[in-house]
C-alpha cells in the first residue's frame, strides 16, 4: 500500500492540484467556507481554544483559518539567553550534525546542503559540518513560523521544484525530498553565526509567505531567484527571538541549518518524532 501511495505522488499533477486548492482556500465562499473549516477542525482534532478567534464563522477564507493567530501568551517564550527556541509547532523529523555537506533525511536517504539551498555554493559552505533540524508541520498544527534567535536578514532565495507531500512516509521513500520540493530559503546573521531557515512547500501548499516580502511568487519556471538585503543601515531587517518570520498556507516543513560550533547541544527532548511547541527550548548555544 505504501508503494502505491508513493507511486501515485509521482504520477499526480501536483502543481495543478496545488493551484486549484490555493484558489479555493483564498476564496470567500460564505457558508461553504465555514462548513469546510468545521470539517477540518473535526477531522484533525484541532484545539480551537488556543486560537485568537475560536469560532469557525470568524474566518472569511480557509487560508485565514489555516494561518490563524494564537491567543497572546499561549506559547510562552523560553527566556534564557543561552538557548534558542523552537520556531514552530510540529514534530521533529530529523536533527543532528551535518556531515560535510550531507544532511540526514531518513534511513538510506541523505541530501546536500548545496542542493537544499538552491546551489548557492557560498551559502552552503557556511554550514559545512554544522547542525540541522527538520520539523514537520501536520495539518492540525499552528502554521506561523517564528525566529529561534534574533537575526538580521541577509538573503532570500526562491528555489522552484516539485510538490511532493512531506509527511513521514514520503520522507522515508522519496530521495532528496526537501532538496527537490519548491522552497524559500531565508539566510540570517545571528550572534552565533549564519542561520538558514528553509520553508519547504508540499502538495496543496498554496503559497509560502514571509513577513518582509509577503507571498513569494516568482514567475513560473525553473529559475532560482535571489534577493540580497542590507545588514546595516536604515533598511536593515532584524527580527527578535520569537518574532514571526513567515507562514505556510496549508502546511509543510521547516529545515534549519546552523554553522559549525554554533550549537552546544540540542535540548534533551529534541529527538526524532518528538512534538515541538513554538517558544520552547530547542538547543543550547556555544559560550
From Swiss-Prot:
It is a peripheral membrane protein. Its EC number is 4.1.1.65. GO terms for biological process: phosphatidylethanolamine biosynthetic process. The keyword Magnesium does not apply. Pfam families: PS_Dcarbxylase (PF02666). Its main location: membrane. Its cofactor is pyruvate. Disulfide bonds: none annotated. GO terms for cellular component: plasma membrane. The record marks 251-252 as: Cleavage (non-hydrolytic). GO terms for molecular function: phosphatidylserine decarboxylase activity. It catalyses: a 1,2-diacyl-sn-glycero-3-phospho-L-serine + H(+) = a 1,2-diacyl-sn-glycero-3-phosphoethanolamine + CO2. Keywords: Cell membrane, Decarboxylase, Lipid biosynthesis, Lipid metabolism, Lyase, Membrane, Phospholipid biosynthesis, Phospholipid metabolism, Pyruvate, Zymogen. The modification Pyruvic acid (Ser) is found at residue 252. The active site is at residues 89, 146, 252. Is synthesized initially as an inactive proenzyme. Formation of the active enzyme involves a self-maturation process in which the active site pyruvoyl group is generated from an internal serine residue via an autocatalytic post-translational modification. Two non-identical subunits are generated from the proenzyme in this reaction, and the pyruvate is formed at the N-terminus of the alpha chain, which is derived from the carboxyl end of the proenzyme. Binds 1 pyruvoyl group covalently per subunit. It comes from the Bacteria. It is found in: Cell membrane. PANTHER family: PHOSPHATIDYLSERINE DECARBOXYLASE, PHOSPHATIDYLSERINE DECARBOXYLASE PROENZYME, MITOCHONDRIAL. Heterodimer of a large membrane-associated beta subunit and a small pyruvoyl-containing alpha subunit. Belongs to the phosphatidylserine decarboxylase family. PSD-B subfamily. Prokaryotic type I sub-subfamily. This is Phosphatidylserine decarboxylase proenzyme. It comes from Shewanella sediminis (strain HAW-EB3).
Amino acid at each position: 500500500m505504501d508503494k502505491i501511495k508513493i507511486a501515485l505522488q509521482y504520477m499526480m499533477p501536483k502543481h495543478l492540484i496545488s493551484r486549484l486548492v490555493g484558489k479555493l482556500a483564498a476564496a470567500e465562499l460564505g457558508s461553504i467556507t465555514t462548513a469546510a473549516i468545521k470539517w477540518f477542525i473535526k477531522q484533525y482534532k484541532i484545539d480551537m481554544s488556543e486560537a485568537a478567534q475560536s469560532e469557525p464563522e470568524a474566518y472569511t477564507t480557509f487560508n485565514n483559518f489555516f494561518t490563524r493567530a494564537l491567543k497572546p501568551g499561549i506559547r510562552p517564550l523560553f527566556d534564557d539567553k543561552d538557548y534558542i527556541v523552537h520556531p514552530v509547532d510540529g514534530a521533529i523529523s530529523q536533527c543532528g550534525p551535518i556531515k560535510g555537506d550531507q544532511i540526514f533525511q531518513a534511513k538510506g536517504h541523505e541530501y546536500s546542503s548545496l542542493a537544499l539551498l538552491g546551489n548557492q555554493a557560498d551559502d552552503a559552505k557556511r554550514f559545512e559540518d554544522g547542525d540541522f533540524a527538520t520539523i514537520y508541520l501536520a495539518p492540525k498544527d499552528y502554521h506561523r513560523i517564528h525566529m529561534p534567535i534574533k537575526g538580521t536578514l541577509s538573503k532570500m532565495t526562491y528555489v522552484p521544484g516539485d510538490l511532493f507531500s512531506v509527511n513521514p512516509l514520503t520522507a522515508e521513500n522519496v530521495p532528496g525530498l526537501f532538496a527537490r520540493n519548491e522552497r524559500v530559503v531565508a539566510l540570517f546573521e545571528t550572534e552565533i553565526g549564519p542561520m538558514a531557515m528553509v520553508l519547504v512547500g508540499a502538495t496543496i501548499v498554496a503559497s509560502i509567505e514571509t513577513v518582509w516580502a509577503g507571498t513569494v511568487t516568482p514567475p513560473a519556471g525553473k529559475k532560482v531567484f535571489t534577493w540580497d538585503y542590507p545588514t546595516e543601515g536604515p533598511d536593515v531587517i532584524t527580527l527578535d527571538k520569537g518574532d514571526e518570520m513567515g507562514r505556510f498556507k496549508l502546511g509543510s516543513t521547516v529545515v534549519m541549518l546552523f554553522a559549525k560550533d554554533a550549537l552546544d547541544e540540542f535540548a534533551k527532548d529534541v529527538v526524532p518524532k518528538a512534538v515541538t511547541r513554538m517558544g520552547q527550548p530547542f538547543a543550547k548555544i556555544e559560550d
